[in-house]
């Protein structure tokens, strides 16, 4: 599970087996998880996060979209 970055208690990562899916990022905090597609940035699924947190997380994903895509390509294209 490569971690792309952390912001506070949130960990942004992807799974090694995610190669066959479109570019996306998982976010976790404690037992809460979410998955965002990146092109365009949109929520795919969520478990445990409140709506306000999801909105904040989506903004963080948008703000770091380029970094996430670069990390994805570097990991899966090597």
Segments predicted by a language model, with ranges:
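Negatively charged, low-complexity tracts enriched in Asp/Glu with abundant Ser/Thr
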Residues: 1-9
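Alpha-helical interaction segments
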Residues: 4, 26, 62-66
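Feature detects long, helix-prone N-terminal segments enriched in hydrophobes
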Residues: 11-13
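C-terminal structural segments of small proteins and small subunits
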Residues: 51-78
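A short, structured beta-strand/loop element
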Residues: 15-49
